A protein has these predicted regions:
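Glycine-rich, N-terminal phosphate-binding loop and its surrounding beta-alpha-beta segment
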Residues: 24-90
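A short, Trp-centered hydrophobic/proline-enriched beta-strand micro-motif
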Residues: 20-28, 65-67, 151-153, 181-187
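Structural signature of FAD isoalloxazine-binding scaffolds in flavoprotein oxidoreductases
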Residues: 76-99, 340-352
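Contiguous alpha-helical scaffold segments within structured protein domains
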Residues: 1-7, 22, 27-45, 102-139, ...
Length: 394
């Protein structure tokens, strides 16, 4: 393959480049959008294929890339996509387009595409995981922790949204932009969402993570939310849940790093519908530095979505939940030919059916010894609101 990167002068909205049938990974307007498919490449071949692309770079520091999602269950085969057209926007304001082989791109035409207009549409929402089943699974995970088999396990449940006509992906992405602009918003082969959680970002030898664990709902009232945030910070249950995640990520990354630092205490990270405990980690990768995909596969799923110890938690999840998570709880993002990339935890998401008329939503919570099943149910309800409102809102 051959690639040609040239600068773009005019501003762009990556949501409009991706539309309803392209690829998107963006946060605060910075990220990438893709159109078409130059190749689908098995995960273990991605680094080699990207490095073999003959690339002319008129911008400087831009590399061919692949975008995709990695399923929750470790070792599940998957492919990343090398788009025929990639439009990118950096934090420093640089904008560019990369074309693979004979691909063409008309910026004016892309910018003039009409945005979807509000319209009436009928939806039904139904649980795929029965409430009693979910509560029983949470209790089983809690009892496993109390007995010493686990330190933590994450139990999730499914709901399905159905419409007589296809769900408008472009409209959903624009609603997510309005409500969750500072989350990592993504759209890849019918998998859409807005994740607040950075799994890993690598640029040169710099590495960053910002894991989240421990959650409380937002009410919309500033004073109530302030009290809830203080209670979240003071909650021993949520602090334990959070500490398990931080310790695992620290211990996993440290062998690759010459330097790794993290916040001594978690802070509260607020998004539109919930508040989380979050801890930022920053480090310097040792030479020879790993490809970001090596770090993604080493970290994912973190205890924020699986549990700890990992093998025992995944075994319990498989038995207790009663469904296959698929791409939920895995990782979503991009990697370039230099081995750099940004990946988020695949949460606050929906997976669309082939005809676009159904969306499967999944949400879960971390279970420790002090977890209460009804409180965990309420937490999943709060988390599901992110995608439910984006899909159903006219």
């Amino acid at each position: 393959m051959q690639a040609h990167t040239r600068p773009l002068v005019n501003d762009i909205d990556l949501n409009d480049i991706a539309g309803g049938d392209g690829y998107l990974f963006v946060r605060d307007g910075v990220g990438i959008a893709g159109r078409g498919v130059a190749a689908r490449v098995a995960l273990h071949d991605v680094a080699e294929v990207l490095s073999a692309i003959d690339h002319v770079d008129e911008v400087g520091g831009v590399h061919p890339l692949a975008i995709g999602s990695i399923p929750f269950e470790p070792g599940t085969p998957c492919e990343l996509i090398i788009p025929r057209v990639v439009v990118g926007k950096a934090a420093d304001g640089r904008r560019w387009v990369t074309l693979i082989d004979d691909a063409q791109f008309d910026l004016d035409a892309a910018r003039s595409v009409a945005r979807p207009q509000p319209r009436a549409q009928a939806f039904t929402v139904a649980p795929l995981t029965g409430i009693d089943h979910y509560l029983t699974a949470v209790a089983a995970a809690r009892d496993a922790v109390r007995s010493g088999l686990l330190t933590k396990a994450v139990i999730a449940r499914e709901v399905v949204v159905t419409s007589p006509e296809p769900i408008d992906v472009h409209a959903v992405l624009l609603r997510l932009k309005a409500s969750f602009g500072s989350s990592y918003r993504y759209s890849i082969d019918g998998f859409i969402g807005a994740s607040p959680e950075l799994l890993i970002a690598v640029e040169g030898n710099s590495v960053r993570c910002h894991p989240l664990a421990g959650t409380t709902a937002r009410t919309g009232d500033p004073e109530s939310d302030k009290r809830a945030a203080a209670e979240l910070l003071a909650s021993e249950k949520n602090q334990i849940e959070h500490r398990v995640v931080i310790d695992m990520i620290h211990d996993t990354l440290l062998p690759w790093c010459s330097y790794l630092d993290w916040q001594p205490e978690p802070s509260v990270i607020s998004v539109a519908n919930v508040q989380h405990l979050g801890t930022a980690l920053d480090g310097h990768l040792s030479d020879p530095r790993p490809n970001v995909l090596e770090l993604v596969t080493a970290l994912s799923p973190t205890p924020a979505l699986g549990g700890f110890p990992r093998a025992e938690a995944l075994e319990l999840i498989a038995k207790a939940e009663g469904f296959v998570r698929g791409r939920y709880g895995g990782a979503v993002g991009w990697v370039n030919a230099a081995g750099d990339g940004t990946w988020a935890v695949a949460i606050r998401c929906a997976e669309l059916s082939a005809d676009g008329r159904q969306a499967r939503l999944v949400a879960g919570g971390g279970i420790v010894a002090e977890s209460d099943p009804l409180s965990e149910l309420a937490e999943t309800q709060a988390k599901l609101q992110a995608m439910l409102s984006a899909i159903i809102r006219p």
